[in-house]
Swiss-Prot record:
Native species: Methanococcus maripaludis (strain DSM 14266 / JCM 13030 / NBRC 101832 / S2 / LL)
SUPFAM superfamilies: Class II aaRS and biotin synthetases
The name this protein goes by in its record: O-phosphoserine--tRNA(Cys) ligase
UniProt function note: Catalyzes the attachment of O-phosphoserine (Sep) to tRNA(Cys).
Keyword Repeat: no
């Protein structure tokens, strides 16, 4: 905490001095917790749900009222709506199926099988029979069967499961049997039911919308088709409603998403639930795929289908594919990857990789950590001392009553060289998925590498870690280790850097995996010629 009064007094006396000196009160974060190794964490929404939300608001702005339609539709309704074409539509529907409930009796043979397992059946026979009967009748759920059998026979549930498996094989190898119920393949199946019921309850005209899931038994999923998708559908019922309402609604919706590039094309499909010549497809342009994508279909329901549902006014329906719209808005080339990114490759960008390059060893104690800063500054200042030469840094640490004098000696004995090698100021960058050490200046860099390194510096993400920074942390963490183990001297010698570990750096496994699988590189080569001798007294 700041000593506020002292600071204010200092500032009153000499503002400039106080302003500069109080700078040290703002403690910098330690290197592994510094930017870009820290990254803001925020939640992320799904593009499909975002589009659904935007479409809901768009419909509401246009005066529509929200409804939820039945998801499960009896095939009879499809016949009612499509007439002779129903089979073609049902072909794209999923039917709901379930496992049959076998009629299993408690024969003498079964009783003796249970008794062979060491269980007395006689006094429990009746309750066991009741359970089997209840299951057949549907009063007992399948997932309660084992528990109920175990309770009836007063045995453990493990034994109950064994009996089910060994004595009642009828429950195994059951094959699902289809019902006449289907999962809706488009919202229309539900609109007929909803509009029909509202006819006597709601004054005309009315404008309804629903954004919900539909299911299609597509032969195969592809870049614009999924087995399950969302339809943002609406129905307008009332005298005078016609195809022009469809065009206006399509424009109203799409223009709220910023689309100006769309076209209406009469649908070749000519579904029997639409009035002839009203079924129209809406296409929007996908800039990345460079093709027109069908995003919606609209039409006026046929008076034949409407009459069967007791509806005696025109109803215009428009069904817009949410995923298709999300694909175009978010510039996704494949609906499968957009909806289920978790099943596809996840690429870390350079910013992500930069947050994963960290110092391997960093001293824990503040005094030793702070010495690193001093060490780095001295090394940078004296890096070009002509050899033979040495740079000595001395420091005394107090731990309770004990004092430790530390002498760090950085030296170069060979004649005619510099104290430190030329790559000492190289900084680690992440560029195009590569982790690279980039020199301060490009003088003397081979022509073939220049372009790549220059681009790395201007377009890549800087980690803010130079070789000398990481190496000095290596020296000070070794010093900390020496204190703990009572070692009195040690040496650090790094002539040429070849890998991250040579300069006390590490990288997260997921970044490393990506670098390897994408044929990217970690190139931190370079001569640093660091020789250090440390003595502790
Ligand atoms: P397509 O010709 O592209 O297969 P469709 O003519 O069968 O589509 P409609 O029955 O008119 O589609 O459905 C209305 C809208 O629902 C389509 O314009 C489309 O945006 C969307 N849609 C239909 N089927 C799928 C699907 N399998 N996956 C994603 N969206 C779909």
């Amino acid at each position: 905490m700041f000593k506020r009064e002292e600071i204010i007094e200092m500032a009153n006396k000499d503002f400039e001095k106080a302003w500069i000196e109080t700078k040290d009160l703002i403690k910098a974060k330690k290197i592994n917790e510094s930017y870009p190794r820290i990254k803001p964490v925020f939640g992320k929404t799904h593009p499909v749900n975002d589009t659904i939300e935007n479409l809901r608001q768009a419909y509401l702005r246009m005066g529509f009222e929200e409804y939820i339609n039945p998801v499960i539709v009896d095939e009879r309704d499809i016949y009612k709506q499509f007439g002779p074409e129903a089979m073609a539509v049902l072909d794209r529907c999923f039917y709901l199926a379930g496992l049959p409930r076998p009629d299993v009796g408690l024969s003498d043979e079964k009783i003796s099988q249970i008794e062979k397992l060491g269980i007395k059946v006689s006094e429990h026979k009746e309750s066991l029979q009741k359970i089997l009967h209840g299951y057949k009748k549907g009063t007992l759920d399948g997932d309660d069967l084992v528990l109920e059998i175990s309770n009836a026979l007063e045995i453990s549930s493990e034994m109950g499961l064994k009996i089910l498996e060994d004595v009642f094989p009828e429950f195994k190898d059951l094959t699902a049997v289809s019902s006449k119920l289907t999962l809706r393949s488009h919202m229309t199946s539900g609109w007929f039911l909803t509009v029909s019921d509202l006819m006597n309850k709601k004054p005309l005209p009315f404008k309804l919308f629903s954004i919900d899931r539909c299911f299609r038994r597509e032969q195969k999923e592809d870049k614009s088709h999924l087995m399950t998708y969302h339809s943002a559908s609406c129905a307008i019922a009332g005298e005078g409603v016609d195809i022009n309402d469809g065009k206006a609604i399509a424009e109203g919706l799409l223009s709220q998403f910023g689309f100006t590039n769309f076209k209406f094309i009469p649908d070749e499909k000519k579904s029997k639930y639409y009035t002839p010549e009203t079924q129209t497809e809406v296409y929007a342009y996908h800039p990345k795929l460079k093709e027109w994508l069908e995003v919606a279909t609209f039409g006026v329901y046929s008076p034949v289908a409407l009459s069967k549902y007791g509806i005696d006014v025109p109803v215009m329906n428009l069904g817009l594919g949410v995923e298709r719209l999300a694909m175009i808005s978010g510039n996704f080339a494949d609906v499968r990857e957009m909806v289920y990114p978790q099943f596809y490759e996840h690429k870390l960008n350079d910013r992500n990789v930069a947050s994963m390059v960290k110092l391997d060893k960093v001293p824990v104690m503040d005094e030793i950590y702070d010495l690193t800063k001093e060490l780095i500054e001295s090394c940078v200042k004296n890096k070009d001392l002509k050899s033979p030469c040495e740079l000595a840094i001395e420091k005394t640490f107090s731990f309770g009553k004990t004092k430790k004098n530390v002498k760090i000696n950085i030296f170069e004995k060979e004649e005619g060289k510099n104290l430190l090698g030329p790559s000492i100021l190289n900084e680690i960058y992440v560029y195009d998925g590569n982790v690279i050490g980039i020199p301060e200046s490009f003088d003397g860099v081979k022509e073939e590498f220049k372009d790549f390194l220059e681009k790395g510096k201007s377009e890549g993400v800087a980690t803010g870690i130079r070789y000398i920074d990481a190496l000095c942390f290596k020296i000070t963490s070794k010093l900390e280790e020496a204190f703990v183990s009572n070692t009195t001297e040690f040496k650090v010698k790094v002539p040429i850097v070849r890998s991250l570990s040579d300069i006390n750096l590490k990288i997260d496994d997921i970044a490393l995996k990506q670098i390897m699988s994408k044929n990217k590189v970690i190139d931190v080569r370079g001569p640093v010629f660091l020789n250090v001798e440390v003595k502790i007294e």
